[in-house]
Amino acid sequence: MAIKTFEEYLKSLRKLKPTAYMFGERIENVVDNPRIRAGINATGATYELASNEKYKDLITTISPFTKEPINRFTLPPQSIEDLVARVKINRALGGYVGTCHQRCTGLDCLCTLSIVTYDIDKKYGTHYYDRFMDFLKHVQKNDLTGNASVTDVKGDRSLSPHEQPDKDMYLRVVGQTKEGIIVRGAKVHQTGSLSSHEIIVLPTRAMGKGDEDYALAFAIPSDTEGLIHVVGRNSMDTREIEGVDCGNIRYSKYCPTLIFDEVLVPWDRVFMFREVEFAAEMVSRFSAFHRQSHGGCKSGKIDAMTGAALLMMDYSGTAKVSHHKEKVIDMIHMAETLYGCSLAASYEGKKEPSGTYFIDPILANASKIHEGKEMAEAVRLMVDIAGGYVADLPSDRDFENPEIGELLKKYLKGATGVPVEKRIKMLRLIEKMAMESADTISDIHGGGSPAAHRLTIFRESDINYKKSCAKRLAGIE
């Protein structure tokens, strides 16, 4: 079956047996662990909406490769329409889950590999593109989720990969057999790795002579022997485990560190091996695609944040306060700016030799620069409207306590006629969207650091053209 339902997605994850740890203990049942399940549910929304009549036509399409219906999260864009659909899907999902749905990064890897493997083959006569296409068809036919395994631990940032005192600071090949390559290292910030069927590895930086062992791209199942998922902490990570004060009662985000401890990668899953000069292209293509994805996703999250702010105005009796309305207008403007930049990046896309369409990198990076600033400002405005109880609202357990619960509810009342429970729930949701570190930090660093976004814009811009405009107007030859 080419398109899975949500239940089929859960069933497919249950068949996997990943090695995973959290809070110092081994996780034996990933799917039913409440902390991980909230993240799995977020990815599961990409499957759920594929069968929802409202979103079905947007999220599903016919694969030009398998000729079967597929989820768009398995399709490298083959047209401008596909590029635009990526942004619209991500916005819809951002509002639907109110956090990261985690599936865009795997698609960004597929997009990248569909371009760069072709380019490598053209130069060296290798067969990476054919290998990748076999993998892509496997992903499409089974509606698999991929995790983008890109960011290395990096060690001493002033040194290149091969110069590191500890050679494992960047993922590298440490052996070869007739079956494949053996790799060792670690990748960090692995959003949704346990929600994924496949781990797709790309280089994290440009490389040069001496870095050949680090110039790798490949894909392996998420439960491959030697692959260890260590779930990271974030500021609200015990709420789901405790079963109270979750705020977002359905979805959340988690980000493991992924350790590759002598992992065997079959040759048919290797998509780049020691071609150092193509590491930079891998990074730049992935980064651009991912920054385009963010513009859709985060505009959708701001939609949910704006809704929360508006409801707090209703529940607190401030719906007619003019300066609150001004803040809401600012939030709407922020969402549309991110969305508009990502749509523009899509409409300005161009077809690559492999047939995949690539977005305009300047506009994609412009969207990400806005996101880094505007998401923080949107959070500030939402909290400004909501008030101080975002920081210190008593626990759900206090409200249910027979001795103090009714007293608390009495003093938490807001607008006349509004049940106090609505106000409490909305305050808790706002706390979640404002203060969950796994999400708020990615608004700044997701897809690369803010400095990287700015440098990319300068590097990709036609500086000489801009100078020529000014020279002509000033009469300078």
Across the structure, where does each feature detected by a protein language model lie?
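N-terminal-proximal low-complexity accessory segments that begin disordered
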Residues: M1-L49
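FAD-binding core of flavoproteins
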Residues: A148, V153-C297, D462-E477
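Extended amphipathic alpha-helical segments enriched in small hydrophobics
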Residues: S293-K351
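Alpha-helix capping/hinge segments and adjacent helical runs
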Residues: I362-E477
